[in-house]
Amino acid sequence: MSSGLIYISLEVLVACLITALIMYYVMKKIYYARGQAILKGASAKAKLMEFQAKSFVEAEEMRMKSQECKLQQQYENKNLQLQTHFDKKEAHLKHLEAQHKEFVRDEKRYLEKEKKELEKERQILEQERENFKKQRAICKEAQAKALDAMLNYMAYTKDEIKSMILEQLEEELEAQKSALIRRYEKEAKEEGKKKSYAILAEATARFAGDYATENLTSRIALPCSDYVGRVIGKDGKNIEAFKKISGVDIEFSEDSSELCLSSFNIYRREVASETIKILIEDGRIQPNRIEEVYHRVARNMEKELLSEGESVVLELELGTMEDELKILIGKMRYRFSFGQNALQHSKEVALLAGLIAEQLGGDKKLARRAGILHDIGKALTQELGRDHVNLGVEVCKRHKEDPVVINAIYAHHGHEEIMSVECASVCAADALSAGRPGARRKSDEEYAKRMQALEEIALEFDGVEKAYAMESGRELRVIVKSNQVRDNQVPIIARKIAKRIEESTQYVGEVGVQVVRENRFKTTATLKQ
C-alpha cells in the first residue's frame, strides 16, 4: 500500500516536472517572440528617426545654402552700390579738385597782374613825390625871394606881417565857427523837436488807459420805506450820530426808496456808504452801533487801501515799497483833481514815463516809480490841508525814496529844475495825461477846494478835534475836545470861526457854524458768580 502511494507520488512529481518544463519552454518562446517583436519595433523606430533626422539635416543644409546664396547676393548688390557711390564721389572730388586748381591758377595770375600794376603805380607815385619835392623847394625859394623883395619895399618886419596874417585868419575862423555853431544848434533843436514828437507819439500810441469821472454823491437803495424812520431814529439821534462821526450829509428821496450820501471827500463818503449798507442789512441802527460799525469799516478800508496799493506796485513792476506809500497809493483812488481820478492819472503818468524814458535810454523802472509817486501828496491834502508837493516830498524822504523821485515831485510843478531823463519823462507824461481834452474839469475841483478851505479854517483853532463841511458848504460842523474846551467857550469859538470865514472866503451866501462839545464816560462792571 505504501509502495503504491510512493509510485503514484513519483508519477505526479514527474508529471509536474514535465509540465513545468513545457511551461518554461513555452514561456521562453513567448518572451523570445515578444523580445524579437520589440527589437524589430525599436529598430524600425530608430530607422524612422534616423531617416527624419537625415531629412531635417538635408533640409537645413538646403535652407542654409539658400540663405547663404541670398546673403551673398545682397552683399554683392550692396558692394556694387557702395562701389558706384564711391566712384561718383571720387569723380565729384576730382572735379572739385580740378576746379580748385583752376581757381588757384586764376587767382595767382590775377594777383601777379595786380602786383605788377601796384608796382607801376608805386613807381609813378614815387616819381610824383620827387617832382612835388622839387616843386615845393622851388616854391619856397620863390616865396622867400618874393618875401625879401616885399620886405625891402614895406615898413613891416617878417614877424609883424606873420602876426597880421594870423590875426586875420583867426577872425575869419572865429566867424566861421560862430556860423557853424548857430547852424548846428538850429539843426539840433529841429532834430530834438522831431525826436521828442516821435517819442511822445510812440508812447501815447502804445498806451491805452481807463478813464474815470468824479461823482460827489452815493445812492443806496432802502429795502422799504420803514427804514427811513429807523435811519433817522428817535428825535433824529441816529442820523445826527451818523453825520457827526462820518462828516457826510445824508438825504432821502421823495418816495423814500433810497438815501443819498454827499461829501466832497470821496474816501470819507465811501466809508460812510459801507457803514450805512451794513447797518441797513443788519437792521440794528442806534448811535452806539453806528459808531462801532463805522470804526470797523474804517479799519477794513485801510486794509483794502494796502491791497490796492500792492496791486498797483505789482502791476507796474516797481519792486519793494513801504506799506505807508502803498496805502497812500490806494487812497488816491478816492481822490479827484479837476475831475480826474488821482490814482488813474498817476498810473497813466507812470506807464507813459516808463515808455518815454525807455526811448531816451533812461531807467524805465525808476521812471515808473517816480510817475506813480509824483502826486502822492494828494492823498494827504484833504486831511492835512497843505500843498501836495511838499507833503509828497516829506513822505518820500521819510521812506528814503530815490532822489529822482523827489526831483520829479518838485519839478512837475516847477519847484525845481529837471535833473535827469527819468524826471523829464515824468514831467512830459504828467502834461500828456492832464492836458488831453476832457481830462479835467474845473468846477468840481473849485467846489472841493471851497469845502476843504472851510474845514481848514476850523482846524486852525485850538481845541478843535474834527471839522466837516456839509450841505454843499452851507454848514460847517465842528467837534471840539471836551478836555480842552469848556461849555461857555463853545459860543465864542463858533463866533470866531464864523468871523474868520467871513474874512477869508469870497463866496456869496451864508455858512452856518455848528460847534459840538460832548462828554463821554465809560466804565466796566464786574459780575460775581
From Swiss-Prot:
GO BP terms: mRNA catabolic process
Enzyme Commission numbers on file: 3.1.-.-
Source taxonomy: Bacteria, Pseudomonadati, Campylobacterota, Epsilonproteobacteria, Campylobacterales
Primary residence: membrane
Membrane topology listed for this record: Single-pass membrane protein
Gene3D superfamilies attached to this UniProt entry: Hypothetical protein af1432 (1.10.3210.10), K Homology domain, type 1 (3.30.1370.10)
Entry's transmembrane regions: 4-24
Record's protein name: Ribonuclease Y
